Amino acid sequence: LAYSLCRYIGRQCEVVEQDWDGMIPALQMRKFDAIMAGMSITDERKKVITFSQGYADEVAALAVMKGSSLEGMSTPVGISLSKPNSDAKKALKTITAALAGKTVCTQTGTIHQNFLESGDVGKVNVRTYKTQDEVNLDLTAGRCDVALAAAVAFTDYAEKSGKPVVLVGPTFSGGAFGNGVGVGLRQASQLGGTLGARDAELLKAFNKAIDQARKDGVISRLAIKHFGFDASM
């Protein structure tokens, strides 16, 4: 998708790798110009960077190994934490009881870690990892009772590895999980001058490109191709 958006804005882009927990500081230090790494748009992140409009709706989910005692956890299919209704509140109570005393693994510096440490699901033993690959490996090795990440991270891993990883409980969205996924950019208002103007123009260009990519069905097609479902917004 990054290359597609770059074509829409008429730029030749280079994709570089960056550790997740250093992503925002590296952007602010101008090591690169934009973040396209499945970063959810949250109020906390908007304090330090700017986001384009959302282009994908990424939901979070809990995952266990097949045969786990948590596999049969019964809750609604999906809940929104932006305006939790009675079903959402009931689901959170069910999850809180199920996770009591369990070790929950997640990637460090993510909205998933923030949610687990917020107290919304009680006091759980949170174990963090630098990468999602490490989370997946320890889940399959039995060092995690359950893991929390973007649902697609688990379904993709299960498909490629053949490991019996299954999703349990509801999917989560809204609230601490943000309002979709967007392109992360530097805050032009904090820079001013030529650099600030450049970043402001880049934001406009990405928003326009996302509009066109959505209209052309590019985002939808890429989501279905790589994730198996339409995650476009």
Describe the residue ranges of each PLM region:
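Solvent-exposed loop/turn segments at secondary-structure junctions
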Residues: 21-23, 40-44, 58, 68-70, ...
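Short, well-ordered beta-strand segments
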Residues: 103-106, 147, 184, 194
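Hydrophobic residues within well-ordered alpha-helices
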Residues: 5, 27-28, 138-140, 206
